[in-house]
Amino acid sequence: MGQMDAGEYDYMRACALAARGKYASAKALFEECGWGDCQARAGACVQPWPKTGVLYKNPDVKGSSAELAVQFNTEADTAMLVKVYTEGGVLARTMFIGGTGKATCSLPAGTYVIKDGVGKNWYGEEEAFGERPEGQYEIMTFDDGSQEVALERNYRSTITVNVQEDNPDAEGVGSDWESWSDF
């Protein structure tokens, strides 16, 4: 039995990453290794988009007295993953929006931090749209630049992202850059 060369070793590592659902990381390693059917395997790492809606609901974040809707206006080949965190940093919900569309989730009334990632190629919930520049990630900011937003009991809050025209009655939503690893 001969020794494994570096390309074959990286190919095996990429296979292990793909098996663990780390498709963006696997794709990058397949593209680098140059071994076997690496190009075909790299292409297979791009996953089909899930349906627009809630992907994850943390069972420990119970309640549904407030509603959050996110409207994403974009090109048909671009998608968004929205992550909603409690004030304490616990992931409460994730929502996926493919192309122009809207996703809505119910949450307990409270204060939240909302992050979003945008891209064309989907690598699953764990790695979303991959590293920059392929995926773009941010933390939404509100009012005075605060990263926190209060969702009130018995109210529906709607956030519209990538609006093509100005709406003088809408409150502005800004953003702070977020790294892929912290997303």
Regions found by a protein language model. Name each.
Residues 4-18, 40:
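Alpha-helical tetratricopeptide repeat
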Residues 40-88, 92-95, 117-183:
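Primarily secretory-pathway and cell-envelope proteins
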Residues 100-105:
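Short, surface-exposed beta-strand/beta-hairpin micro-motifs centered on an aromatic residue
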Residues 110-114:
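A short tyrosine-centered beta-strand micro-motif
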